[in-house]
Curated annotation (Swiss-Prot):
Gene3D superfamilies: 2.60.200.40, Probable inorganic polyphosphate/atp-NAD kinase, domain 1. Keywords: ATP-binding, Calmodulin-binding, Cell membrane, Cytoplasm, Endosome, Kinase, Lipid metabolism, Membrane, Nucleotide-binding, Nucleus, Phosphoprotein, Synapse, Transferase. It catalyses: a sphingoid base + ATP = a sphingoid 1-phosphate + ADP + H(+); L-seryl-[protein] + acetyl-CoA = O-acetyl-L-seryl-[protein] + CoA; sphinganine + ATP = sphinganine 1-phosphate + ADP + H(+); sphing-4-enine + ATP = sphing-4-enine 1-phosphate + ADP + H(+). A motif (Nuclear export signal 2) lies at residues 161-169. The modification Phosphothreonine is found at T193. Its cofactor is Mg(2+). It comes from the Eukaryota. This is Sphingosine kinase 1. The active site is at D81. Acetyltransferase activity increases in presence of the kinase substrate, sphingosine. In Purkinje cells, kinase activity on sphingosine increases in presence of VEGFA. In neurons, kinase activity increases during the first 24h in presence of Amyloid-beta protein 42 to decrease after 96h. ATP binds at residues 22-24, 54-58, 86, 111-113, 185, 191, 340-342. It is a peripheral membrane protein. It is an enzyme of class 2 (transferase).
Length: 382
């Protein structure tokens, strides 16, 4: 099969797409929804596709590691955010990761956590919607073929793991809700509402050290020992055994209800977590809630977050900072981390954002402005 060219910022017409679908995601109806809601639009828009159903955890990761990507103009992922996490990490594990990660991606919501799709929906100028309405909007964006670059978060853990996030890392309340609501996944995204009320009933406090590199901070010199591994070089990070560089900000408080690092606007299709808008290139949102917040105040925050109004409450315990890197060192192994909705062992972790590092189907062809916007258009196939 001959590869095709990808014009700047647009998928070609006709277009070939590899669709990875988790039939067990969300309410377990993703396949039926694809056949009834997505497929007719694709056929009309001259988008041919191959559909692969994932069979187990990390199946999508294995598939994209081995796939001949030149056969496809884009990869579409129909599930929750976790399957996109698998795909991106699979692409970054390939020997040709530098070109593989530029293969355009499309998020089709079919899971119980659809924050990435909700964010793309927001960037396209659509109203906040859920379920089949959100799926149809994202399908229409694929049919329109427009691409936009997105930031990528590189993470390192104390045990030596390196992984990548396309959406978020959370610790504390949000991660607990992710974990404990898993048993309600057949309810769809309402599982998070149920989980929130259960967790509010028994609010936990987590102890740890949080540090970050704010946007606009200029170092007198680059750290002497930056992390160098396969993949993009994390120039702002030093090994976890070393103290953070002196130009970083260390949060004096060490008791938290939650810490959230977020690359996009939504935490779910019904949680507009970052109403300040799309991150600039090379920037991510850091939110944390300090211990001392009451259950009632925390509930008000999450209820207001449904409409993006939580920052207007001026809660003294809620802090938001735009950052380019962070480090979080839990004092114990109690609890978990959630990375793009996928659970990770609780241990020291740090990360930095890489600007405009991957391409996604989106409603706007404009790249996020700001820091070091280096990525060009997706490469044309030879």
């Amino acid at each position: 099969m001959e590869p095709v060219e990808c014009p700047r910022g647009l998928l070609p017409r006709p277009c070939r797409v590899l669709v990875l679908l988790n039939p067990q995601g969300g309410k377990g109806k993703a396949l039926q929804l694809f056949q009834s809601r997505v497929q007719p639009f694709l056929e009309e828009a001259e988008i041919t596709f191959k559909l692969i159903l994932t069979e187990r955890k990390n199946h999508a990761r294995e598939l994209v590691c081995a796939e001949e990507l030149g056969h496809w103009d884009a990869l579409a992922v129909m599930s929750g955010d976790g399957l996109m996490h698998e795909v991106v990490n699979g692409l970054m594990e390939r020997p040709d990761w530098e070109t593989a990660i530029q293969k355009p991606l499309c998020s089709l919501p079919g899971g119980s956590g659809n924050a990435l799709a909700a964010s793309v929906n927001h960037y396209a100028g659509y109203e906040q919607v859920t379920n089949e309405d959100l799926l149809i909007n994202c399908t229409l964006l694929l049919c329109r073929r427009r691409l936009s670059p997105m930031n990528l978060l590189s993470l390192h853990t104390a045990s030596g793991l390196r992984l990548y996030s396309v959406l978020s890392l959370s610790w504390g309340f949000v991660a607990d809700v992710d974990l404990e609501s898993e048993k309600y996944r057949r309810l769809g995204e309402i599982r998070f509402t149920v989980g929130t009320f259960f967790r509010l009933a028994s609010l936990r406090i987590y102890q740890g050290q949080l540090a970050y590199l704010p946007v606009g901070t200029v170092a007198s010199k680059r750290p002497a020992s930056t992390l160098v591994q396969k993949g993009p070089v994390d120039t702002h990070l030093v090994p976890l055994e070393e103290p953070v560089p002196s130009h970083w900000t260390v949060v004096p408080e060490q008791d938290f209800v939650l810490v959230l690092v977020l690359l996009h606007t939504h935490l779910s299709s019904e949680l507009f977590a970052a109403p300040m808008g799309r991150c600039e290139a090379g920037v991510m949102h850091l939110f944390y809630v300090r211990a001392g917040v009451s259950r009632a105040a925390l509930l008000r925050l999450f209820l207001a977050m449904q409409k993006g109004k939580h920052m207007e409450l001026d809660c003294p315990y809620l802090v938001h900072v735009p950052v380019v890197a962070f480090r979080l060192e839990p004092r114990s192994q109690r609890g978990v981390f959630s990375v793009d909705g996928e659970l990770m062992v609780c241990e020291a972790v740090q990360g930095q954002v890489h600007p405009n590092y991957l391409w996604m189907v989106c409603g706007s062809r404009d790249a996020p402005s700001g820091r070091d916007s280096r990525r060009g258009p997706p490469p044309e196939e030879p």
